Amino acid sequence: MTDVVIRRGDKLDMPFLRSLLAFAYGWHVAAFDTFDTSIYHYVDTWGRDGDSALVATEGGHPVGAAWFRLFPATRPGFGFVDEETPEMTVVVIPARQGQGIGQQLVSALLERAKADGYPALSVSVQRGHADEPLLRGQGFEQVREERDTLTLRRAL
């Protein structure tokens, strides 16, 4: 197995990030008859102020990514806190999950957000999802719960 390299993402990575959204929401998508394409607002029109992505590669191939984006209150993400707090998404392809790549991505993205001057990051996670302990271990704290979905926030 080769070493994982984390690099800055750009517009050329958007098809990969878009494909990762199916994995991010796939663990509960079975409850729906069709895949909810409204989640694509997490990557559509990439390059706006406040967009930042990191891509994890292994042997030159992308295996995961983490990114954050600001959302307006009129079109919030699932983990929306306020218009000044970017919402984070972290996804590792299934074949590489459980190997610490997600933790590396979260740590690196927290550093990126702090360097960019943001006071916090938020994230949405389903209660009981494997990422919940990882996020709490990185200092994310619950700010809201709706049904089985948690909104977590990490001050930077």
Residue ranges and their predicted role:
Residues 19-35:
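Helix-loop element at the rim of GNAT/NAT acetyltransferase active sites that forms part
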Residues 98-113, 136-137:
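Conserved acetyl-CoA-binding loop-helix of GNAT-fold acetyltransferases
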Residues 87-98, 125:
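A short, internal acetyl-CoA/4′-phosphopantetheine-binding micro-motif in the GNAT/acyltransferase core
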Residues 113-126:
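Conserved GNAT acetyl-CoA-binding A-motif
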Residues 82-85, 125-130, 136-138, 144-156:
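C-terminal "cap" of GNAT-fold acetyltransferases
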Residues 30-59:
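Active-site rim helix/loop that mediates acceptor-substrate recognition in acyltransferases
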Residues 57, 63-89:
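Conserved acyl-donor/pantetheine-binding loop and adjacent beta-alpha core of acyl/acetyltransferases
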Residues 3-19:
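A short beta-loop-alpha structural element at the N-terminal edge
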